Amino acid sequence: HIGWQVAVNHRLNATRNPYAHIHKPDITIEEVRSSPMLWDPIRFLESCPSSDGSCAVVISSEMHARLAPRPPAWIHGTGWRTETGHFAGRDEVNPRAGQECAAAAYREAGITDPGTEVDVSELYIPYSWYEPMWMENIGLAPESSGWRAVDEGHTAFGGRHPINPSGGVLSGNPTGATGLLRFAEAALQVRGLAGEHQVDGARRAIGHAMGGASQFHALWVVGSEKP
């Protein structure tokens, strides 16, 4: 039922975001559970759409950021890593590139416990089960415990660590812009400009992008205060 719960959480989150491409305010666990099977165990309503859209992020100097009429998001740390898509012994569920990408960003940001030091995360989750998988991969949850965070409601809107309050990739997947949208949504959160899907008190946020056979990873940590 974990995947079903993730799908419900993200689609309900999307109802607060006017830019989300799927709005299903009446979605239920039963509706997800009974939707057509794509490939076991992923069902239709646990998968992302394919849609059109765009995204832009303006990165400036500190001087120009301070002159802006609205508060900036300060970049605390960044990471990029790539690995070969297929090789003997590769762990596609917990890829090394994802681990090292996150570790690099956390080092730069001075984060030692992302699960408690980050307030909200926008993760690249095209299928429901990627939520607990990426939480473990980038250090938001201990190994084999990501599912528990979902089950206990910690990743829902209003939970201890909300994941994808925008509705995420499950609610809008404009190919080519999807990853950058995660970065932009993280920035909106720490700027206090996320509208109805704003997480109260969000001071630090993660934006995470992924591509290929889970082999390309990018992550940034942004904050409301200058690092």
For the regions a protein language model found, what residue spans apply to each?
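Phosphate/pyrophosphate-binding loops at sites that engage ATP/ADP/AMP, CoA/4′-phosphopantetheine
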Residues: 67, 102-117, 194
